[in-house]
C-alpha cells in the first residue's frame, strides 16, 4: 500500500519526538526510580535481616539479581511495595469461590493437622490461614527491627494501618507485603482468560504464564469496603491475588514495555492528582486490554506507539466517567473501588486535556 509523502513525514516526525521523549523524560524517570530503589532496598535489607534473626520463618527474599531487586514494585515516584515470599504453603488448599473479588483463602487440607503447618498459630478455628494474623505478627517484628537498625534515625513505621509501611528519609513510603508464590496452578476466578477467538497472547505464552502462576499477598483489599462484620472478618483472613509476573511476561515483545514506561512517565508528570485516582497499575491493566485489541506485533512497532497511547487514554477516560476499571485477569474486581467520585471526575477532565493535546498537537511530546 502506498503511503502519502506528507503522512510519512508526519510519522517520521512523531517517531523522532517519541524517541527523544524516551531518551530524556523516560530515562530520567527510570534513573531516579532505580536510584531510589537502591537506596530503600539497602535499608529494608538491614531491617529484614534483623526480623529473620528474631523469627526465622520470615526469611528475607529481597535479593539483587543482575543489577535489579526482585519483588519490588513502583507504585509512584515516592511509593514502593516490596514482596516478602514466605515458605511452606503446602499443607493448605487454595480456595477462590468468588465470594471476595480479587481475594482467596488458604484452608488446611483435609486430614492435615495444624501442628504440621509452619504457621500453626495463625490458623483460625475454621482452619483458615489468616492473612491478617501473619501481617500483625510481621508488623510487630518490623517495628522492633526498626528500633535496632543502624538506620533507625531515618526510618519510621507508619502506625495508622494494618499493613507494614515504612517512611524512609521522610521522602519514601515502602510497603513490605508477606506473600506466598503459587506456581503450577491457576485461579478459578481467572479461568476465562485468555478470551477465546483473540489471537493474543500466543498459546505458548499462555502456557508459560499459567505454569508460572500468581502470588497471594497479605494486604488490605478495597473490594471489601462497607461490607458487614462477618464479611469483613472473613476478608481479614483472605489473601489478595497478584499477577505481577504474569503481566510482565505478557508485555514482552514489540514496544509494549516501552509503551508502559511512557505511560508511567506521563502519569507521573501530569496525572499525580488529589486522592491518587490514577496509578501506574491502572495504566498497566489498560495496556493489557489494548494488547487484546491490537494483537499483532506490527501494531506495537515504534511507529504505532502514539496511537496505542491515545487508545489507552481514551479507555481510561471511559473508565473514569463510568467510575469502573475492571482488572485485566479478574474483571469482577473494580480497581476504582474506594476512590471518591469527585476525584474520578476531575481525573477524567485532566486525562481528556492531556489526550486532546496529544491528538491535536503534532509537537505535543516536545513539552509533555
From Swiss-Prot:
A matching Pfam family: Mab-21
Cysteine pairs bridged by disulfides in the record: none
Family listed: Belongs to the mab-21 family.
Full protein name: Protein mab-21-like
Source organism (scientific name): Drosophila pseudoobscura pseudoobscura
